[in-house]
Amino acid sequence: MIALIGNLSRDLKPGRPPFVGGGPFHGARALQRLRVPARIVARCAGADREALLPPLVRLGTPVRYVPGDATPTFGIAYDGDRREMRVEELGDTWAPSDLPPLPPIGWAHVAPLSRHEFPAETLAALARRCRVSLDGQGLTRVPEVGALRLDANFDPEILRHIWTLKLANEEAEVVGDPAALGVREVIVTHGSRGATLYTRGTRTDVHAHRIDTDPTGAGDAFMAAYVVARNAGFNALGATRRATAVVAAVLARG
């Protein structure tokens, strides 16, 4: 069994009402296709629960709701695969005590929306239960309201507690050489074009057929599929290939 853990977001795009986002939601879109044992641990402000939680629950994976005080809110616009974002509100920070009891799990993917959400001590507590993968947003996104900024001023202690790190292209540019981070598996995703895996001193490109559609959540769907494959016994390269194919199917479905 695997778990997806993170804050739900309230996303704003031109020409449409606010809608649910965040790693738990977009990862659940992949889990809906894979139909494997999994749990989702999701958090948002109590005032937003009725708006944000039902769309997640409808995707079919059992959900554990963690009450929160704030809901991360983003304004989002795309130019092809290039995303422009504005932070309207920051979400809650998770303490170790916020991690609920779960059935035995082999892997958990943690999907922060900003650097402050999952500090090293919380990841350390989770790593005592299972292998942990982390979205690079939890390293590079500066926790402030306004135009989204990235920098490399993260706590390096975080890297000690994770097995796999997923970076988008722009995050990889900020942190530097992925192979030098000291993480067992680093995956750099390239939007709809595939991914690059760094592991055991090797670099492997995994290509995908480009799909002209909104790529929001592609990285979250990728990592949900990746940890499912790793938990099922795939090696890192096999899991990367599997996740690339799953993301293509999820994006094609819309």
Report residues per predicted region:
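Alpha-helix C-terminal capping segments
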Residues: 28-37, 229-231
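Short beta-strand scaffold segments in enzyme catalytic cores
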Residues: 29, 74-77, 194-198
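Extreme N-terminal starter segment of soluble prokaryotic enzymes
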Residues: 1-3
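Conserved phosphate-binding/catalytic region of the ribokinase-like
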Residues: 177-254
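Well-ordered beta-strand positions
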Residues: 40, 163-164, 185
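Active-site metal-binding loops of divalent metal-dependent hydrolases
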Residues: 7-8, 221
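Conserved N-terminal subdomain of the carbohydrate kinase-like
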Residues: 10-18, 33-111, 116, 122-131
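Conserved beta-alpha-beta core of the PfkB/ribokinase-like small-molecule kinase fold
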Residues: 107-179
